[in-house]
Regions:
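Solvent-exposed alpha-helices and their adjacent loops that cap or buttress functional pockets
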Residues: 12, 55-60, 96-97, 122-124, ...
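N-terminal ligand-binding/catalytic initiation module
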Residues: 1-155, 381, 385-389
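Short, acidic/small-residue loops that bind anionic groups at enzyme active sites
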Residues: 150-164, 280-285
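Rossmann-like adenosine-cofactor binding region
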Residues: 232-301, 308-309
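General beta-strand structural signal in soluble alpha/beta enzymes
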Residues: 105, 131-134, 155-158, 189, ...
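Glycine-rich phosphate/diphosphate-binding loop of Rossmann-like nucleotide-binding domains
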Residues: 74, 81-99, 157, 161, ...
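Adenosine-phosphate binding glycine-rich loop
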Residues: 158, 282-390
Length: 390
């Protein structure tokens, strides 16, 4: 039986991976009068007088919505909101299991950016944070930007930033192994969608100087006029030498390859053209840009993928639960670059110097100490950067 057949049976058995449970008992009239009428009027009055009291008298402080329109689901593409629901339920389960965050799925039957934004803004009073999920680019950039402008709670598109944080954490540790500094590297990012864009921007924030971003047509550079304004932006902040050509051209003399693109597009010959002790994060799923054994045979030093059956899995579950735990605990108004970098360091530091080796640069997903470390680091960064409100 395949994992897909087994999962179908699993989902049929449980008929949903989430349920709502009461935190209080209602066993007599006194309980009823406290939990509901007439007693409930008093916290209502308190919140009406001071809206921040909602964090004291309701579950707002620990509640996150996992919101999707179903337009970019896993490797399935645009399958619509209803078909995306199992993924959003699963994401909500991970929030609860890994960081005790109460998350619930909301799938929206619209692809219109402004309709999505308006809908989320209208339900935001219930929420302490918003996790955007599986929304196609470039709409995901617009939706996140507009929501951040209108809301004072964390808004986080995990497909962008969760991936970027794990990539940075892996790169921090990989650089210890090859004894290189990020500012000296040539980094090639293949894939200019949501993940590739966020990875590029976070690495630049961390100190990278020479990143070349490729899409299916080749390197983004300043000699090309792009109809996509996000490509234009990337071209203006990357590729300092204004290189042109397709992937096999620009990967020459690169120190790092980061793939969020398509299967089997990196050959052994391309790896051989990279600098010595090359680092490759080939994250296309289920088939990576190059398989680890092939990359190693071609001379690569450190290889990561998106798969759990190879070493060094780039897995967002190491990031998003702890990030939201930390942000919620200090009532952060946003998740900023300082918090993302702090999370990346916390994840990287969860691998000790004694454990660190080319096949172990990223901790295992079920090491729950990682989430605690991430949460603490994010809280501290939120306080230092001025976005914590308690």
């Amino acid at each position: 039986m395949s994992i897909y057949e087994e999962s179908l049976i699993f989902h049929e058995k449980y008929k949903g991976k989430l349920e709502i449970k009461s935190r209080v008992k209602v066993e007599n009239s006194q309980d009823l009068s406290l939990a509901y009428t007439p007693g409930v009027a008093e916290p209502c009055r308190a919140i009406h007088k001071d809206p921040s009291a909602a964090y004291m008298y309701t579950r707002k402080w620990n509640t996150v919505a996992v919101i999707s329109d179903g337009t970019a689901v896993l490797g399935l593409g645009d399958i619509g909101p209803l078909a995306s629901l199992p993924v959003m339920e699963g994401k909500s389960v991970l929030f609860k299991e890994f960081a005790d965050v109460d998350a619930f799925p909301i799938v929206l039957d619209t692809k219109d950016v402004d309709e999505i934004v308006e809908t989320v803004v209208r339900i935001a009073p219930t929420l302490g944070g918003i996790n955007l999920e599986d929304i196609s680019a470039p709409r995901c950039f617009e939706i996140e930007k507009k929501l951040k402008e209108r809301l004072n709670i964390p808004v986080f598109h995990d497909d962008q930033h969760g991936t970027a944080i794990i990539v940075l954490s892996g790169l921090i540790n990989a650089l210890k192994i090859v004894n290189k500094n990020i500012e000296d590297l040539k980094i090639v990012v293949n894939g200019a969608g949501s993940a590739g864009t966020a990875i590029t921007k976070l690495l630049l924030s961390y100190g990278a100087k020479n990143i070349v971003v490729c899409d299916r047509d080749g390197a983004l550079n300043r000699d090309i006029e792009y109809s996509n304004k996000y490509f234009e932006e990337l071209a203006n902040i990357t590729n300092p030498n204004n290189e042109s050509g397709i992937l096999k051209d620009v990967i020459k003399n690169a120190d790092v390859f980061i793939g969020v693109s398509a299967p089997n597009i990196v050959s052994k010959e391309m790896v051989k053209s990279m600098n010595s002790d090359a680092i490759l994060f080939a994250m296309a799923n289920p088939t990576p840009e190059i398989f680890p054994d092939d990359a190693k045979e071609a001379g690569a030093k450190v290889i990561g993928t998106g798969r759990s059956d190879f070493p060094n899995q780039i897995n967002n579950v190491l990031a998003f639960p702890g990030i939201f735990r930390g942000a919620l605990d200090v009532r952060a108004t946003e998740i900023n670059e300082e918090m993302k970098i702090a999370a990346a360091h916390a994840i990287a530091n969860s691998v000790s110097d004694e454990e660190l080796n080319p096949n172990y640069i990223i901790p295992k997903a079920f090491n729950l100490d990682v989430q605690k470390k991430v949460a603490e680091a994010v809280k501290e960064a939120a306080i230092k950067s001025g976005v914590a409100t308690i």
